């Protein structure tokens, strides 16, 4: 379970459980502790500014980055009300390029279409997804590879299908791996070696 129902005027759901889940299984880790350089994008709902986390609590930054506006309550960070960064930059390729990435891989989570909503929350989620998906084509053009998991029949509230969703994401990633490796190899042999080492390390965790 990743959400709790709430009667807050700022959102229908709380995603505090996401933060608790991360801290339970990863501990109180910081973004800068990641073995792979990491940036997490959120948006300030009061100003419309993009907020990029490169340091600080991993749990807090993910909570902010997953707060779909109107559905989830914004996450308060340093006095700012933060929500899902997709409303300002759905495919944050520019952030990766600024960090020095030579090959950028995007993931399109809207390729499965939309399921008929069965609740007010699902109506809001569909509306959000439809609006955001209209921007992914333009922003996604900047990515070298776009991975498109088959998500037909699922919704953002399908926490009971987590294992199936993980498996589909893994399958889609493996299918794109040869293309990614080729691009990384062109970027430099050392880049390919680093990619393979990081991938093996991830598989062992």
Model-derived features: positions:
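Patatin-like phospholipase
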Residues: 1-205
């Amino acid at each position: 379970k990743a959400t709790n129902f709430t009667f807050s005027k700022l959102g229908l759901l709380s995603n505090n459980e996401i933060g608790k889940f991360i801290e339970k299984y990863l501990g109180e880790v910081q973004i800068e502790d990641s073995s792979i350089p990491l940036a997490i994008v959120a948006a300030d709902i009061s100003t419309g500014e993009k907020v990029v986390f490169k340091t600080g609590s991993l749990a807090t930054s993910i909570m902010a980055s997953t707060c779909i506006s109107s559905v989830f309550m914004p996450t308060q960070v340093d006095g700012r009300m933060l929500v899902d960064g997709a409303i300002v930059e759905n495919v944050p390729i520019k952030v990766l390029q600024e960090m020095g990435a030579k090959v950028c891989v995007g993931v399109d989570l809207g390729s499965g279409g939309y399921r008929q909503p069965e609740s007010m929350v699902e109506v809001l989620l569909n509306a959000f997804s439809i609006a955001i998906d209209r921007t992914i084509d333009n922003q996604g053009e900047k990515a070298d590879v776009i991975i498109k998991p088959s998500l037909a029949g699922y919704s953002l509230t399908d926490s009971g299908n987590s294992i199936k969703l993980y498996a589909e994401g893994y399958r889609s990633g493996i299918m794109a791996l040869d293309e990614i490796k080729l691009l990384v190899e062109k970027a430099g042999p050392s880049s390919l070696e680093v990619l393979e080492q990081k991938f093996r390390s991830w598989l062992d965790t």
